């Protein structure tokens, strides 16, 4: 059994008119089932409106399914008595770090979550130290978050979630508002947490380059899972990804075009090094 289990999830956004009658129903999720193993790094891809962000919000009880069940460490998110434990187990990081950072000083913000959990003061500071060190933000602990770059703010937001000692972190497009440098530093931080701390990562994104090193890639379209496999397996299906209005990494696209032109290359090339090695072999 995985740390996260989604069983036949259905979620509908319902819009009401002025008389509170149902006016429109948007079927955001249509029978999604996923089992995510503890310690894994899973990326969920999809264009806008695919259902991926709705799925993320169901993972720690921000939203509850219209039908189906979400289990976090065998706890149902729909059981109110378990909701606090669910949110301690599966921490959430959002697109905009400004919506998540509330402290006037970095270290105070990181300690806010553990303090509200009733953690003893001495342990709070131990957690703050460890979390800031893990995301490479110790040198900024006494600074105002307002003076940080977007990437630094997002790392502080991740540290704040880490300080609550979750077993899993759900990141809903955490790099969407960042420049390329900010995106790289945040993704590097997330991978280090996964490898060094053993934290399960569920990354929601539409940036193809961010998922190359994931253990597993899930593609959503129209509220359903349409592809599921390793990065190499998923990116081997370039024409299918284009059908779902998704791009592929630039090097994968180049290899695909060369293959379409008649060159014999492997499917699912993900790095420049892979492509160079194959071309060198073909041309030698």
Show the residue positions of the predicted features.
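The feature captures the beta-strand-to-loop junction immediately N-terminal to the Walker
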Residues: 45-47
């Amino acid at each position: 059994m995985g740390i996260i289990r989604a069983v036949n999830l259905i979620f509908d956004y319902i819009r009401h008119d002025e008389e509170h009658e149902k006016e429109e129903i948007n079927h955001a999720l249509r029978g999604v089932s996923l089992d995510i193993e503890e310690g894994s790094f899973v990326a969920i891809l999809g264009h806008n409106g695919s259902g991926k962000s709705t799925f993320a919000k169901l993972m720690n009880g921000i939203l509850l399914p219209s039908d189906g069940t979400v289990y976090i460490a065998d706890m149902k998110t729909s059981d109110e008595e378990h909701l606090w434990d669910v949110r301690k187990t599966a921490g959430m990081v959002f697109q905009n770090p400004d919506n998540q950072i509330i402290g006037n000083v970095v270290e105070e913000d990181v300690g806010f979550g553990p303090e509200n959990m009733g953690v003893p003061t001495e342990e709070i500071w131990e957690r703050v130290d460890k979390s800031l060190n893990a995301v490479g933000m110790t040198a900024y602990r006494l600074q105002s978050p307002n003076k940080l770059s977007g990437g630094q703010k997002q790392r502080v937001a991740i540290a704040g979630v880490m300080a609550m000692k979750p077993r899993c972190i759900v990141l809903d497009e955490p790099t969407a508002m960042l420049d390329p440098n900010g995106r790289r530093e945040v993704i590097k931080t997330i991978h280090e947490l996964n490898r060094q701390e053993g934290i399960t990562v569920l990354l929601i994104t539409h940036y193809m380059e961010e998922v190359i090193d994931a253990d597993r890639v899930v593609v959503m379209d129209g509220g359903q899972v349409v592809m599921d496999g390793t990065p190499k397996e998923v990116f081997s299906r370039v024409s299918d990804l284009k059908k779902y209005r998704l791009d592929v990494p630039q090097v994968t696209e180049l290899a695909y075009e060369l293959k379409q032109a008649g060159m014999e290359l492997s499917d699912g090339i993900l790095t420049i090094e892979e492509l160079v090695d194959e071309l060198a072999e073909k041309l030698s």
